[in-house]
Amino acid sequence: GDVYKRQHYTTARDMSKITLAALKNANFVKYSTTTEYEYKGYTLPHTNLMLHPGYVTYYYEYAQGIKTGSTEQAEYNVIVKASKDGYNYLAIVMKSPQQKIKNQSYLTKCSFVDAKSLFEWAFDSLKYTTIVAKDEVIGEVSVENGKDADTVALVAANDTNVIVPVGLDKSAVIIEIQEKPSSLQAPVTKGQKVCSANIIYGDEVIASVP
């Protein structure tokens, strides 16, 4: 039957939630990332052409699975994951055209090209980085009735690691302390939890410091 429904919509975010939940199922991972499947004497290749070396324009050695789909209205779509050097990314490309690119004589399914470009950018441009190190001082708070000091340092309980752009200038990162008390009553013990902090980059909270 006709799969097109006028009010049938979804988003890349919706697809990511469904896919991430499905990837928790070992059988789903096994079958959705199988490059080809033998069935009754036939070899059935995965419809994601990024998995097949023979398709030079599309092939991406780090790609795995997951799902492709196309209709006249939705054009070309792909959900694919890639793993490299300990990093794992999920690319979801929707409503991508089929067209000639770079003076080619044939039509290119741009969903695969776009997903490949996204992965190449992510692996080259993003890095897992320690933004705040364990025991790093991020502020201070006054202490009432203290014997040796009027203030104590607020330090991070653990390392806080986040994926950020390569070469990030840490001055662009804002550490915003949350619910800081006006003062503490002595005695204050080492390791005592006082408050937390948000790490903000580009007007977005990217992590929290306990």
Briefly describe each language-model feature range:
Residues 3-4:
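Short, small-residue-biased leader/transition segments that mark boundaries at the very start
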Residues 8-210:
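Domain-terminus/edge residues, biased toward the C-terminal soluble/receptor-binding domains
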